[in-house]
């Protein structure tokens, strides 16, 4: 009997020990989970505090524009200045005047000044890669706009340029060479990737959708309006007939128009930018019949918004594309 009671007591003690052991493990797990939650909450609090601190800080942004004399870049700059004012930021805007060496010097100066971010509208897609790398080594984020770089900025904000070229080609097919036969030419800007994208969008669309509209000539104007006039003159002399010329920028279209007018040619022009000069010519009802319009103000504003998000720790897309649209006699204002 005593032996039986002893066995029962031993069993009860064993159960008691197991129960205590289980309770101890549960308590330990709960404590660890609680500690982990506290750490996560603390870390999240630090992140939010850092974001709030960043939001309250005044920032200085260095901006190097391709060419400040271009109406398109004037509009970008104005939009950026308005957005910066809203944020309480300072913009240090410099004009590269189409000179890659000058732009490099401006970026180096921004680095010396320890600006919070740098924006580049590259004078040259390949050459801007080294500028981005220099800034990154200094811990300064770089953003590009309008013209893409061969480097890797935080984000690139621009018009969807291939789509823009496609819109120009669609306009040719639907409004100029409606029988899908004829000759087209392109005045391009081969040093600038965004302009090459416009050319590609145009020529690819015609190849796929109107193969009997032949692109008989493609020449580079290198961003020089007078050279565009010379190029157009050369095209008219070389080719028996050019029904339409697609110009990858309005300065090229202005140059082309002067040569077409001088030759009394019937060649139609489609420009690209949507600048006031182009719109004015379209309203006259002459050779310049359409323009692919960009949204420079949208590009400027969106670039500043992307910088703000990045500086506050938010993720931004590597590329932000803004849709272009066609201006012709129907909607020219």
Locate predicted features.
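A residue-level marker of the well-folded mature domains of exported/periplasmic proteins
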Residues: 13, 17-333
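Positively charged n-region of N-terminal signal peptides that target proteins for export
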Residues: 1-11
